[in-house]
Amino acid sequence: MKKSLKIMGFSLLSATAILAVGCKKKSTTDLSSTYTTAESSTEKEIKTTAAPTAPAQNPSAVVDPAFKTQSSTYQSDNKNVSIAYPKLAEMQDTAMQEKINALIEKNATSIVSALGVDPTKDKLDIQSSINNSDNSRLSIVYKGTLTKADGSTQAIFYTNTIDLKNGQDLGLKDFADAETMAKYLLSDDIQLSNASADVTNKFLEKRKSKSVEDYTNMLKNADFPVKSSDGKTFPSSFSYQNGGDIYFTVPVDHDMGDYVTVIYSPKTK
């Protein structure tokens, strides 16, 4: 492997590693973007609410003096697989920094094995953004597209929240109750993020095919770490927090975009 990292300091906004043979890393994109556009929906009315767009960040600015970030990319030799992910730098606890960076890379690239991506035939392009960070936790969002050899595509979305104090994965179960989220998912109050009226209406109907117990079990197993020893059982749902709100994904049919993102706002419940 070849590794070339470019240190990039940037403002961390409030708001995941499969090692294939012959892969390399190189510097890549700024990770300061964030997904904050929300769409409120009911069966009778579709209402869109766009969150304010964050101003452009100064690449040299560092809000949190506890650490800086680096942008790194995992690539196959033929560049058919490209996964961008952040790395931490200049932490006072260098052992913890190494542990966290290894965890970030492992989780970020685990999508390759989980989806059975063949770099000689398939193409996978994943970009990342830091969605929430402070001295205690780091939340990373990964978004991209998998194009199979037969031309079919799949929208990819996953997240990784890490406890910076102990270098462990955090999941939905660490900041929300799975059953409460499942009941909300099936309620009339549900809100979806960035979903069209057509997708929203289809999801509101299709969700009824599953029970509270079904969704509770899915959400109890949301997020990293990967639950199987072979690393091939990827979580069905991923979550993160942004501005006090809880976001989590639900898998749907390909014609609906492969996933929808549900927004739960504790302050309004």
Where are these regions (language model features)?
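C-terminal motif of bacterial Sec signal peptides marking the signal peptidase cleavage site
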Residues: 19-22
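Sec-dependent N-terminal signal peptides
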Residues: 6-14
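Compositionally biased intrinsically disordered regions enriched in Thr/Gly
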Residues: 4-5, 24-269
